[in-house]
Amino acid sequence: MSDRLGQITQGKDGKSKYSTLSLFDKYKGRSVGAVRSSVIPRHGLQSLGKVATARRMPPPANLPSLKSENKGNDPNIVIVPKDGTGWANKQDQQDPKSSSVTASQPPESQPQPGLQKSVSNLQKPTQSISQENTNSVPGGPKSWAQLSGKPVGHEGGLRGSSRLLSFSPEEFPTLKAAGGQDKAGKEKGALDLSYGPGPSLRPQNVTSWREGGGRNIISAASLSASPTELGSRNASGADGAPSLACTSDSKEPSLRPAQPSRRGASQFMGHGYQPPTYHDMLPAFMCSPQSSENQTTVERSSFPLPQLRLEPRVPFRQFQMNDQDGKERPGVARPVRPLRQLVERAPRPTIINAENLKGLDDLDTDADDGWAGLHEEVDYSEKLKFSDDEDEEDVVKDGRSKWNNWDPRRQRALSLSSADSTDAKRTQEEGKDWSGTAGGSRVIRKVPEPQPPSRKLHSWASGPDYQKPTMGSMFRQHSAEDKEDKPPPRQKFIQSEMSEAVERARKRREEEERRAREERLAACAAKLKQLDQKCRQAQKANETPKPVEKEVPRSPGIEKVSPPENGPVVRKGSPEFPVQEAPTMFLEETPATSPTVAQSNSSSSSSSSSSIEEEVRESGSPAQEFSKYQKSLPPRFQRQQQQQQQQQQQQQQQEQLYKMQHWQPVYPPPSHPQRTFYPHHPQMLGFDPRWMMMPSYMDPRITPTRTPVDFYPSALHPSGLMKPMMPQESLSGTGCRSEDQNCVPSLQERKVTALDPAPVWSPEGYMALQNKGYSLPHPKSADTLAMGMHVRSPDEALPGGLGSHSPYALERTTHASSDGPETPSKKSEREVSLPTQRASEQEEARKQFDLGYGNALIDNCASSPGEENEASSVVGEGFIEVLTKKQRRLLEEERRKKEQAAQVPVKGRGLSSRIPPRFAKKQNGLCLEQDVTVPGSSLGTEIWENSSQALPVQGAASDSWRTAVTAFSSTEPGTSEQGFKSSQGDSGVDLSAESRESSATSSQRSSPYGTLKPEEISGPGLAESKADSHKDQAQKQAEHKDSEQGSAQSKEHRPGPIGNERSLKNRKGSEGAERLPGAVVPPVNGVEIHVDSVLPVPPIEFGVSPKDSDFSLPPGSVSGPVGNPVAKLQDVLASNAGLTQSIPILRRDHHMQRAIGLSPMSFPTADLTLKMESARKAWENSPSLPEQSSPGGAGSGIQPPSSVGASNGVNYSSFGGVSMPPMPVASVAPSASIPGSHLPPLYLDGHVFASQPRLVPQTIPQQQSYQQAATAQQIPISLHTSLQAQAQLGLRGGLPVSQSQEIFSSLQPFRSQVYMHPSLSPPSTMILSGGTALKPPYSAFPGIQPLEMVKPQSGSPYQPMSGNQALVYEGQLGQAAGLGTSQMLDSQLPQLTMPLPRYGSGQQPLILPQSIQLPPGQSLSVGAPRRVPPPGSQPPVLNTSRESAPMELKGFHFADSKQNVPTGGSAPSPQAYRQSEWMKNPAWEP
């Protein structure tokens, strides 16, 4: 209104009441009326001032205030009338420019006049502009030099004058120039072709406006002028007419801001990268390091690359050539840089001459030397010199040492500092050492170009890390040198990296580097050795304190003894370990080999790069790694990254360098790489710093082993430090896993050497530090308690490919080295360390990735690379490749070898070994957690007692994880071990097989009888377990029915080729393992194996007798103490989140009763999630799982009398036959007890069937973890994300465990597994595992009713069964049936089976494995409130339990179950599980 009124008031001359536009006209002495007239058309919005806004909008600077702000840049605004007073000078000045341009660049000057004319034509002031142009041409002699009172000498004069003028008069207007120059600048800005005909939408003054406004106005005139000018200027610059370009540019002083704008705009637009002409004015990040405006358009078009090249590339070239030629590249790079500078200088639009700018740049360079950067813009990425860094600084003198020490160690330090103050201390030490490593990394940053493969990068963890010493040693010095000086160049790179001073410095550096390279290679070798020694010493010092904490000799023994054992073990069982260790090993060994390697590295850099590339390709180069994560990335980002990759394959080298920079420097010099990034992306003013989070040019080929976070500057993302390390390990672990076969020998050597340095990886280094440095365990004990929940989560998140491997490898090493007597202490140490590590790691990881996405990344990076790399991560895209079939085969072979070799020695640790490294860690962590957290409960002690043996196995677990479940096989899980081995080797396929074997075993031990029949089935092992849990089993026996025993036996052996094989193996392993004191013979439940396959976990081994071992499956992390069944069960439950995951089967009968005590154990949901994820992936990977289920499941189903859970567990034994008799947990197997009874689909299966979204079983395990309610909370959430989607993420990834916890914190007590996130598309029965842990604490679902729990699901595919949801608590059923009714509970669980119409097992009953823990039915009472399922449904559960078992997962139809389900009200039967929905429903069918 006002606008309309105002305009009306003003008159119809088009001048609005708003005098801003009219002011322009007044100032100009022109009538902007025409322009306004065009704008004047008033629409309805105009009354709102929209039109006025539009009018004003065209030239933001049209406002008087803006005018004053941006003087004379608005082509439409002639502040001073053209009386010539002020403008005459400017016109004359423009004339000099035009004339100069005409003379020097006739094309440009002419285009400018033409453009100006076009602009003037467009503009009202066309005539005046034309006149000005004309006048300018005649007045051409007038230049800024004249304005400055200096001889014009169009080129020389202007240039000279510009040189004389340290700054543009425009920039620093004088009173004299104010009238003339300033106004001239204004008018010329106004006349500036770049501004276009109408009111300039851009800032009036480029100079004042960062040149953002000064950039070409997006108008035809400006564009044409820009291209023309660009062409001419670039031509002049390129032609070596920088003087002309500069002169012409300089001579159009007023235009210079504009021309810079033009040039910047057109070039910026054309190339998407136009360093601000007034880089001095612009923030460093805004300006390209070089005022590359002067760069040729061609150069500029490639400028983004050149910039990468310039900063990284020059170093890279230097180093490439240094590597190869040593000098050629530096020369080339230098030429590029000087070229840029020259071009930059010459065409530099700023009034100041290139030389002046250089002078300024030199000043800036001086300023750059400071941490504040060129324009006093703080270079936050600049590594500040701190006392801690002083050593690094001194090392920086050595160049490579500084960065070498800085990066890896600092990464580690960062990880460790997060992990532990002790670790932080160590980190400080290592920070220095890491500087060396990072220096290598940094150098590698440069090196990668010589090693063109970004694979170098992605082999980074292993390759670059080891190459750090090799090439890194070489390049470290250079890189350190370069980076020493280069950080300012990077900044300058942002601002005016091209300044001659910087160039000279760089040349000097390059020359020095070349000269010093030889000595530095030698020095690097020596220094690397020193650094490695330092790292080792620091690690040993830390380790010694840490082991002193528990086992001082352990760290040395582990480090020294473990490497020998770990060497073979690492090679076989711990591909990841070699990887994780390898980088450090590279560093450590490389110091020795560094001189040779460094030199040969330059020569054999490509060969090294090749092998590393191979390994990296397998493990996933950063690009691949990112490809993996690119899924996480928005498509546009992926696309952009791909495009960038394509655009910048040259840059890819640089980018590798760049990524290396970013990756490595992300830690110590994140800003420099960051700056490099910023300069690259930021150089476009539109740069979104968030891109900094991503590798500047993510190479899709580079596997996202390095989490995007890794690319985030550590400053930007905390995880940048930790995660990048993790990715390194992931790269190393993954790549070296692949490399383990390729590079294992050297890696192993290195590993042996750098066994401890492996902790370099942030998660891993941190974990390794924790594992090895046992200082952590103490802090970690507290952390374990505090972080117990998260302990596994971090470990799970990180353990996979990264964190888990390092600690796990360390654990494994530890176990291997001191598997026997030391096992308990080691184990406890490890456990303490691991939980703590995990806690810290997860905390770190969560800090880094608070989002599920972050966790998913971590999980994928760690879990997928590590745990899943072998098993489920093989499914993971990034790591499927990493763990190629060949690799998997190798791993499996190694596993089997290890298995066989370790069967006896690894009995105790075989369990853990089966567990994926992170699970092993989790187990250790859980056991530790239990030890620390649940010491009050017998669980903790027993876990320690019982788990110690198993946990030590976990130490080897990494190997086992690597080598399937080699150790696992040896222990009772021996059966699982081999089965798991196959499963792991198959990484899911085997999982089914393993599940089958597990199914058989589980069926034998746990299936129908839970652990009852295992006596018969398992024979000695079961008998032993039986002894432990026989009393409990006695309860179950009655319930499990001997007939079921026989059935289970036959079935257990009958599970199928794999199942039988594994059953036999399990039997063997069980017998052998059960012979172990606390051996987790119980792994009999295939579930454990099942879980093992995905998350090869030693049988849950709750300490329950092997029979109870049914549970043991779930605690993939359970160490499987078989000791006191109940205590063990509690231990396992308490200490094994994984157990709880699958344990919904906790053997609700007796064990769950004891397990009620178990409840205290809070399993980090991450562990469960991890397992579930693993299981899910395994499930996805191995359709055979259903086959397992079929053999095992058939047996189970055949044995309906057995606890349905058991029977279902057998069915479910596809889970490894977690034989969920106690595991009514909504077993993933939807059909087994579709009614839910035997179905207790044991969301363990969720783990097993990682891809199966119904990971509710995690929730079930959560029941137990629920006992540690908060901790357990995590798991349920894992349910919430569709597990399919989360499969890779693993629940932990997809859903931050903490989130899961949060989700379930509300559900905390029950953590009802019934709460299946709708996204868990096929989470058949959302078993409110609360039942398992539902023990009294959880039995009391917080007021949440099953419906509530389910309701979150109501939106989800499976409709929350109305009241009928019958989140039957096994507890409830258990109450009614008593623990013995546990089977009934299983049956009842089917009641829980809510028609999950859409869930894979459509109705997979939300079986509340409460019965598992509900033995007393205590949970029941608590669950009673939640007992949304009508009591009637409970009874049906019993029926279902017996009858559903026969169902045998027949397509998971409830047809069989239906008989039972009818009462179950859940109506799971109506919803025969959609087999399709079941991950492998068909497979499930017998």
Curated annotation (Swiss-Prot):
Residue ranges, compositional bias (Low complexity): 600-611, 638-656, 998-1007, 1410-1421
Composition bias type Polar residues, residue spans: 88-137, 219-235, 288-300, 960-986, 1181-1191, 1457-1474
Superkingdom in the source lineage: Eukaryota
Keywords: Coiled coil, Isopeptide bond, Phosphoprotein, Ubl conjugation
Modified residues (Phosphothreonine): 228, 753
Crosslink feature (Glycyl lysine isopeptide (Lys-Gly) (interchain with G-Cter in SUMO2)) location: 251, 751
UniProt record, GO biological process: in utero embryonic development
Keyword DNA-binding included in the entry's annotation: no
Transmembrane segments: none
InterPro entries linked to this entry: BAT2_N, PRRC2
Residues recorded with modification Phosphoserine: 166, 168, 222, 226, 387, 415, 479, 555, 621, 762, 793, 1070, 1159
Pfam families recorded: BAT2_N (PF07001)
Coiled-coil residue windows: 494-544, 880-904
Biased composition (Basic and acidic residues): 422-433, 478-488, 501-519, 1025-1055, 1062-1074
Span list, region Disordered: 1-20, 39-306, 320-341, 385-519, 531-658, 792-847, 893-918, 950-1080, 1177-1205, 1410-1443, 1455-1486
PANTHER family the UniProt entry points to: BAT2 HLA-B-ASSOCIATED TRANSCRIPT 2 (PTHR14038), PROTEIN PRRC2B (PTHR14038:SF4)
Protein name: Protein PRRC2B
Originating species: Mus musculus
Gene: Prrc2b
